[in-house]
Amino acid sequence: MRHSIRRGLTVASVAVVSALALSACAGTASDPGSTEDFEPLTSIKLQLQWLPQAQFAGYYVALDKGYFEEEGFDSVEVIPGGGDIVPQDVLANGDADFAVAWVPKVLGTLEASGAELTDIAQVFQKSGTLQVSFTGDGVEEVADFEGKRIGSWGFGNEWEIFAAMAAEDLDASGVKITTQDFSMNALLDGDVDAAQAMTYNEWAQILETENPETGELYTPEDFDVVSYEDTEGAMLQDAIWADTARLDDPAYADASVRFLKAVTKGWIFARDNPEEAATITYDAAIAAGEGGAFPVGPTHQLWQMNEVNKLIWAGGGFGVIDESAWAKTVKGALAAVNQDGLNLIMDEPAESAYSNEYIEKALEELEADGITVDGEYTPIEVTLTKGGQ
């Protein structure tokens, strides 16, 4: 069953595909470094890493507000992901034009498969990963992981843990990495000593849960939190990836710039209007039906929007890849060794693994139109409620 929401956005509960049918083509950006004539692309697909939630608000806002239409696209599909969907594989197989995925996950895929993909915009400038334990359980820093049950979702999300451990000379064999689901139940049920969480999702989930000892919601003071952003294992996360070989095609390169312009406008709107952006994303999650991300309550989505903005807007231009942060991510990926003694990567990635050429062109054109493309985010106050409703 399909449910319609604003501007023709649709989300299928099984296929979970968001689509926007737009009108006539607008002006296009020129391909960086090419003046060759070409027929502009007007139809594209974007593969997300996860289900509809404010982690991806900028893309849903761009759909809702017509920003893709403004950049000359007739049809845009935003395809939500899930635990069994690997965005970089979808992109490499030609089933999407662009994909959103964490940098270390893609680096591992590139080395293992020989695929060639390029990070053309680094949406998240900071790591949002946490390791959360109950206060007093003795897990206050990465060095405390030794001998503990450390929860992780797997699916490539665990490598930041191993990178942080490697920086502390902590052997993975001395830590029990325990698979947890995409909730905080493993911590609440005592199955792990510290659970993996994102600042914008699972951390809110546990603060939306009632403490059985008090009858009130848990508070931050009930927990010790290790933020990977504050460790040497911090890695770059949500990035927009393109097909490296196709970037030699002037039509695809041009579409990449126009796509990034629309996405940038979406994220700028989400920064300046977090409440409305959260509502737009909530509508998309509701339209996804039972396949929607858990939990999809409006208060939870507003919390998520607030926290995601903190990861994106670090003061520089939107989406620009910081060379030092990239180098730190690569260093962590090279050092990370899992509990089975396997490395994430053994060699430095190719130079083509990232490029600022396309995002810088997009920002330049937006600035020429009078749009401010950099800045910091001023957080709003969000009061969590039970279940995020």
Describe these PLM feature segments.
Residues 32-180, 185-189, 193-197, 226-228:
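Short, glycine-/small- and polar/acidic-enriched structural segments
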Residues 182-185, 192-289:
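Pocket-lining segment of extracytoplasmic ligand-binding domains
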Residues 70-72, 142, 218-233, 249, ...:
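Short, solvent-exposed loop/beta-turn-alpha elements that line the ligand-binding surface or hinge
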Residues 327-389:
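Conserved C-terminal helix/tail region of periplasmic/extracytoplasmic solute-binding proteins
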Residues 78, 119, 177, 270-281, ...:
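Surface-exposed patches in mature extracellular/periplasmic domains of secreted proteins
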Residues 67-71, 168-171, 211-218, 288-292, ...:
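Short helix-capping segments at alpha-helix termini
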Residues 1-42, 363-389:
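Short, low-complexity disordered leader/linker segments with a strong preference
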Residues 250-341:
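Secondary-structure end/capping motifs
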